[in-house]
């Protein structure tokens, strides 16, 4: 079952960020953070610095998208 991770870091341009992402392991959360920040701001992995990855409970999540994804019991593909 996936967990909710809060990924905290900054970029070499000085932008600080906190992302809430789903992942099985902390490595998965870091990869998702690299993907999201890189695509949104056109940055490479060397320009993104991850400072901390913390597991948080669904009640502590502020992202509505993450809360919704955690509430899904099953997915049916047609």
From Swiss-Prot:
Alphabetical GO biological process terms: translation
Any matching Pfam family: Ribosomal_L18A
Cross-referenced InterPro entries: Ribosomal_eL20, Ribosomal_eL20_dom
Keyword terms, alphabetized: Ribonucleoprotein, Ribosomal protein, RNA-binding, rRNA-binding
Keyword Ribosomal protein (UniProt): yes
Cellular component terms (Gene Ontology): ribonucleoprotein complex; ribosome
GO MF: large ribosomal subunit rRNA binding; structural constituent of ribosome
Entry's family note: Belongs to the eukaryotic ribosomal protein eL20 family.
Subunit structure of this chain's protein: Part of the 50S ribosomal subunit. Binds 23S rRNA.
Protein name: Large ribosomal subunit protein eL20
């Amino acid at each position: 079952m996936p967990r909710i991770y809060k990924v905290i870091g900054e970029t070499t341009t000085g932008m600080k960020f906190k992302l809430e992402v789903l992942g099985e392991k902390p490595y998965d959360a870091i990869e998702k953070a690299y993907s999201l920040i890189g695509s949104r701001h056109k940055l490479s992995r060397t320009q993104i610095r991850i400072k901390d990855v913390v597991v948080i409970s669904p009640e502590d999540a502020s992202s509505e998208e993450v809360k919704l994804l955690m509430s899904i019991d099953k997915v049916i593909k047609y």
